[in-house]
């Protein structure tokens, strides 16, 4: 059995602050489950161009608000209780809300190692 808290993760390299968000990588590749679970806080008033070329991601919003935009310009408001799935390695814009952070639980397949970091200075977007 694996039991971990957000507090436990903050003292490890599986707590990643990549500028526009923080991510607690609660379950990673080394745990052998075949997927990762992350608790991510997308900071209010931030925009990140992202793409997961090596992972599929499902996100469930547990608090706050924000939005995700696909590369066709479709904008999807995300609030508590909403889910979005990047099932085609979709490049996307991830935005925190205007007044509130967006809090997500994310599932990655295949799993993350836990130390991946977004690099937001690439005009083509951050990928891993």
UniProtKB/Swiss-Prot annotation:
The keyword Protein biosynthesis does not apply. One of its GO terms (molecular function) is ectoine synthase activity. Pathway: Amine and polyamine biosynthesis; ectoine biosynthesis; L-ectoine from L-aspartate 4-semialdehyde: step 3/3. Keywords: Lyase. Coiled coil: none annotated. It catalyses: (2S)-4-acetamido-2-aminobutanoate = L-ectoine + H2O. The keyword Lyase applies. Its EC number is 4.2.1.108. It holds the Pfam family Ectoine_synth. GO terms for biological process: ectoine biosynthetic process. PANTHER family: L-ECTOINE SYNTHASE (PTHR39289:SF1), PTHR39289. Catalyzes the circularization of gamma-N-acetyl-alpha,gamma-diaminobutyric acid (ADABA) to ectoine (1,4,5,6-tetrahydro-2-methyl-4-pyrimidine carboxylic acid), which is an excellent osmoprotectant. Belongs to the ectoine synthase family. NCBIfam families: PRK13290.1. This is L-ectoine synthase. It comes from Bradyrhizobium diazoefficiens (strain JCM 10833 / BCRC 13528 / IAM 13628 / NBRC 14792 / USDA 110). The lineage of its organism: Bacteria, Pseudomonadati, Pseudomonadota, Alphaproteobacteria, Hyphomicrobiales. The gene is ectC.
């Amino acid at each position: 059995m694996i039991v971990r808290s957000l507090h436990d993760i903050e003292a490890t390299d599986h707590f990643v602050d990549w500028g526009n968000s923080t991510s607690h990588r609660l379950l990673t590749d080394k745990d052998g489950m075949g997927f990762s679970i992350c608790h991510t806080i997308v900071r209010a008033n931030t925009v990140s161009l992202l793409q997961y070329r090596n992972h599929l991601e499902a996100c469930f919003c547990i608090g706050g608000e924000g939005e995700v935009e696909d590369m066709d310009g479709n904008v999807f408001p995300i609030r508590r209780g909403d889910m979005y799935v990047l099932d085609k390695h979709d490049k996307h814009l991830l935005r925190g809300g205007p007044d509130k952070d967006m809090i997500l639980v994310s599932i990655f397949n295949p799993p993350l190692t836990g130390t991946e970091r977004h690099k937001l200075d690439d005009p083509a977007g951050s990928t891993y």
